[in-house]
Amino acid sequence: MSHLKIAIRVSQLIILNQTANLSNPYESCALLLGSKKENLYEIKEVIPMNNKDSSEVSFTIDEIELLKIYKYAESLNTSVVGIFHSHPSKPFPSETDKTFMEINPIPWLIKSTITEEMRCFIFSDSSRGKIDGIEEIDLVIVKD
């Protein structure tokens, strides 16, 4: 897989940070709508979601709400191009994340509510040189 990037606007980062802060100490989650052109995922809309788990170690998005978002994305001629969630630890995928990343091979943005750092990862079919098939991708911050 060639070097991937995900572009996010400053205003979208603010929404994700607010989502994480409001849910703390529990994990927060959001869906990222947009498009992919060649090696660039472009986020067009951030949709904060409710974490059904109300947990510090996991998140689950309600299936009915998830279906609504997929239909909404389709109506905008976009798709879900990323999943965001927060960790009350370092911003790296957990073992559970890795399992779901393989099922949903789109960018996963993870924010640490401890260090405030945000990183992005994706499951890669070509796992050579990557840990558990997970590859970090560049997060490109775009001015509004």
Predicted regions: what they are:
Residues M1-V80, P88-D144:
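Conserved beta-strand-loop surface patch within small alpha/beta domains used
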